[in-house]
Amino acid sequence: MENMAEEELLPLEKEEVEVAQVQVQVPSLASAPEEAKSKRHISIQRQLADLEKLAFVTEGNFDSTSSLNSDNLDAGNRQACPLCPKEKFRACNSHKLRRHLQNLHWKVSVEFEGYRMCICHLPCRPVKPNIIGEQISSKMGAHYHCIICSATITRRTDMLGHVRRHMNKGETKSSYIAASTAKPPKEILKEADTDVQVCPNYSIPQKTDSYFNPKMKLNRQLIFCTLAALAEERKPLECLDAFGATGIMGLQWAKHLGNAVKVTINDLNENSVTLIQENCYLNKLKVVVDSKEKEKSDDILEEGEKNIGNIKVTKMDANVLMHLRSFDFIHLDPFGTSVNYLDSAFRNIRNLGIVSVTSTDISSLYAKAQHVARRHYGCNIVRTEYYKELAARIVVAAVARAAARCNKGIEVLFAVALEHFVLVVVRVLRGPTSADETAKKIQYLIHCQWCEERIFQKDGNMVEENPYRQLPCNCHGSMPGKTAIELGPLWSSSLFNTGFLKRMLFESLHHGLDDIQTLIKTLIFESECTPQSQFSIHTPSNLNKQEENGVFIKTTDDTITDNYIAQGKRKSNEMITNLGKKQKTDVSTEHPPFYYNIHRHSIKGMNMPKLKKFLCYLSQAGFRVSRTHFDPMGVRTDAPLMQFKSILLKYSTPTYTGGQSESLVQSASEDTVTERVEMSVNDKAEASGCRRW
């Protein structure tokens, strides 16, 4: 009937109806009131081809997203821009029109959920009444049409902020019904035998609700090995992934550790929570909400399939959740700094539990935004050769202060600083005594700006008359002005626990995580401060021989810990004594703080030895030495900088001799070597005088 009525219209009347329709309604199965709202502006399109089609629509072939105007349909091959008036852009050839649409409309658009809000020059902004009451058109100008509330925004930056405010309020549904109701298919990624669905633009946090970063794979594997090592101490563990996003980390815990863990995945974003639940069903895991299993999980599984485990998914603020419930393991991975969640994490964490903190605000931690580091962490830092370890000690100091405020101490299990993140994992020790011992390990660092020698300040509250005396170098006496700077406060104790790292290595071998085994081995060498040649990997058949070294998990101390947790009582005197003995042993074998970069301290006009040979030379000289994961060319050693340079010069060959033998260079006297080292230090100081911090 509608087609017959349309055919009865005269051609002139039909053309007038088409001109009056500025926006064409989208055909849908919705009711009539909903169809009245299903209108969107023609400047909002999915692809550039859809925008180009608007200018090439012929009569009788109207697209649902077209806006037809009599000016757009010119005779011949000339076409007018559908988003510009005739006065602004005259009709032109098709290739010029395509270039115009691409450069002046599509490239300056604002993207939201697969749609592009292109810039519009049509007189579609609301008119303004004057004093008399007559309506006058506003000044012709470019503007955007909001995809959510249909508002018109002039500037692109204002449009971005406008859409961002909608997202912060949770208003992500458009006020119209899209032309194609089918959503773009979600991509399925696989990592560690775990499948996850990800949204489009999943690697760009500004363009998606559920952020998934493939570059954080090492971080997720380190956290998994940490939890697997903790699961051997006591079972079951209450685990929390406070910022789930796609839920990949919690899914790996539940899928590979099974009944040893009770996983809770939390996220504040509703879309992320929905995606986490879908990923749970994808991996055959039941979703538990308020201690009740969702009936949907049983319907999705096919015949013969069984659920692997249960996961509790919550939607609330991470601080609120950590105040309401107690956990054995908490992982914090917010977008940016994590200092806003540390107090809540230590509020209800159980004794001997583990808190892992991932910080991605590397611009402030790596001394690129020093004012932000002062604001977030309350410390003063500068860019040094050991800036990555400096960042790790800054985060540990913030964690230690948060734990001390809750009458808890910490034991650092390991700290990793890589290109994209800083990961710190600590064990929680309850009691004011542990809190006081932890607070004493937060100290200031004295850093020489000329030679980059460094040392932690001595304990005590008395003001020292000349703090430069604490530095091993004599730059203050030979250089003018103030040569040192005070950094911190920082964590001054050890960053690694050798026994726990060996247990993590065993778990990585057990679960087949080959990507992080090299990193964990480097951490073990670094914690013991020994060359790699002195380390050997033991097979599972030799685990009984390695019980005292921490590879085998069920030791005597672990049995005492299990009994204590089962009884739910305070620590016995025997356990406190064993803990004190263990701390004394750890202090005696504590690795030296910080490291030296061999390239940074190279001698001008000399060829350096290979790094492996140089480590052997330092070890033969009686110093503890190892490589470090913080810097591929870094050397962790307890040798002072003067001795470090002396040995480096001793085994370096001059460049001008054309390969002089090492025996001739080694025959130089110690006095001559020392003089040459001092001369090289002075030359570098004069050359770098213009780059003082």
UniProtKB/Swiss-Prot annotation:
One Gene Ontology cellular component: nucleolus
Keywords assigned: Isopeptide bond, Metal-binding, Methyltransferase, Nucleus, Phosphoprotein, RNA-binding, S-adenosyl-L-methionine, Transferase, tRNA processing, tRNA-binding, Ubl conjugation, Zinc, Zinc-finger
Coiled-coil segments on the chain, per record: none
Pfam families documented for this protein: TRM
EC number: 2.1.1.-
Zinc finger (C2H2-type): 144-166
GO biological process, one term: tRNA N2-guanine methylation
Residue numbers covered by motif Nucleolar localization signal: 95-99
Subcellular location: Nucleus, Nucleolus
Binding positions (Zn(2+)): 448, 451, 473, 475
Protein family (similarity comment): Belongs to the class I-like SAM-binding methyltransferase superfamily. Trm1 family.
Protein name: tRNA (guanine(27)-N(2))-dimethyltransferase
Organism this protein belongs to: Macaca fascicularis (Crab-eating macaque)
Underlying gene: TRMT1L
